A protein has these predicted regions:
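Class I (Rossmann-like) S-adenosyl-L-methionine-dependent methyltransferase catalytic domain
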Residues: 1-42, 57-105, 146-208
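A short glycine-rich, Lys/Arg-flanked "PGG" loop and its adjoining helix->strand segment in the class I
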Residues: 129-141
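Residues at alpha-helix caps and immediate loop-helix transition turns in enzyme cores, especially N-
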Residues: 107, 127-128
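Conserved class I S-adenosyl-L-methionine
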Residues: 46-56
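A conserved beta-strand element that flanks and buttresses the S-adenosyl-L-methionine
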Residues: 115
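Short catalytic micro-motifs in class I SAM-dependent methyltransferases
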Residues: 118-119
Length: 208
């Protein structure tokens, strides 16, 4: 999907997500619980800096902003960022497609957390592991990558969700398979929690 898709979706995005979440249907079954789980990790530690990749309308990032965190928010949709700016007027916003390259403005910066919610699955499968590794230099010591997404422990779990979702399933997305990522990134520590039949939250960092 390109930026124009999300520009056109921006006005109705939050309502569409809410409807899918409330119905416990694909693709956003468990959405609020995903956000709550990620927020619980972040808000349990002292205030610092967060990089939110694919921030969208800023629904999650605004929780951290309101709690005093310094937010750097990246998205490729200007219309989405307009909504995020309303929620976080003093945050730092960068318009860019992180799947192609991180903004140069981030060079040399480090964060307690790098967060991605419902964005990582836009990366092609062959790029996902390398992308995660490319984020490591941006983490402070003991920093974590937090991913909430349509994602699965195994390929079999994905196939079950696909069957359950029927015609609604989108075959053009690249929903992460945790088992495969762990095999490709043996030096990283993965913790994950299954939130719904089509959502997990991952917490990723260097093994110590």
């Amino acid at each position: 999907m390109d930026a124009s898709h999300f520009d056109n979706w921006a006005e109705n995005y939050d309502d569409d997500v809410r409807e899918s979440n409330q119905a416990e249907s694909y693709p956003f079954a468990g959405y609020e619980r995903v956000l709550d789980r990620i927020a619980s990790y972040v808000l349990a530690v002292p205030v610092g800096k967060i990089l939110d990749l694919g921030t969208g309308s800023g629904t999650l990032a605004s929780r951290f902003y309101d709690a005093g965190w310094e937010i750097s928010a990246v998205d490729f949709s200007e219309e989405m960022l307009k909504q995020a700016r309303e929620r976080m007027p003093e945050a730092r916003f960068l318009i860019a497609d992180f799947a192609k390259a991180l903004p140069k403005e981030l060079d040399g910066q480090k964060f307690e957390f790098i967060v991605m919610t419902y964005a990582f699955h836009h990366l092609e499968y062959e790029k996902q592991a390398d992308f995660l590794r490319s984020l490591l230099p941006f983490l402070k010591e003991n920093g974590k990558i937090l991913i909430g997404d349509i994602s699965f422990e195994t390929k079999m779990d994905l196939e079950k969700a696909k069957l359950q979702s029927g015609e609604e399933w989108d075959d053009e997305e690249f929903y992460p398979i945790i088992e495969g990522l762990r095999e490709q990134l043996p030096d990283l520590h993965f913790e994950y929690e299954v939130i719904s039949f089509c959502a997990t939250v991952m917490r990723i960092g260097l093994k110590v």
